[in-house]
């Protein structure tokens, strides 16, 4: 049986939307899907398709993974905010609302990739049993 592995070489540029009409177009769902798909080995979709034969069931599984990655991403972002505030960070006002001051700002897409890789590890473990 072919094993699923986790790809730890995904970069922020890999998950950016390719065809966006405007910068205000929300692309988080696309980034979430790209992040976890790219975090799995090339054979992962074939292994999943062989295990979950029904297309509707497989699509429901993919949506569940999307939710799991999204929830993990939010968890990591909240953890970063809490740790930053505990370390003395302050919120500043910008034209878009409140955010952490520059010294504590991080790249949200990097945290998304970490979240996707954490979920990918679970997927690999589940399918490699």
Curated annotation (Swiss-Prot):
Taxonomic source organism: Enterobacteria phage T4 (Bacteriophage T4)
One GO BP: DNA replication
Keyword presence, tRNA processing: no
Pfam families given in the database record: Phage_RpbA
Protein name (database record): 15 kDa RNA polymerase-binding protein
Keywords: DNA replication
Cystine crosslinks: none
Top-level taxon: Viruses
InterPro entries for this protein: Phage_T4_P15K_Rpol-bd
Functional note: Binds to host RNA polymerase core.
Keyword Thylakoid carried by entry: no
């Amino acid at each position: 049986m072919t094993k699923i592995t986790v790809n730890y070489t995904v970069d922020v540029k890999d998950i950016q939307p390719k065809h966006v009409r405007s910068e205000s177009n929300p692309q988080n769902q696309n980034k979430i899907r790209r992040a976890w798909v790219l975090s799995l080995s090339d054979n992962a979709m074939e292994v999943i398709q062989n295990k979950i034969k029904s297309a509707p069931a497989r699509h429901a599984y993919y949506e569940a993974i999307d939710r799991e990655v999204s929830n993990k991403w939010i968890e990591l972002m909240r953890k970063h905010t809490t740790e930053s505030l505990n370390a003395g960070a302050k919120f500043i006002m910008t034209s878009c609302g409140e955010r952490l001051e520059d010294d504590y700002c991080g790249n949200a897409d990097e945290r998304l990739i970490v979240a996707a890789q954490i979920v990918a590890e679970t997927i690999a473990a589940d399918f490699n049993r």
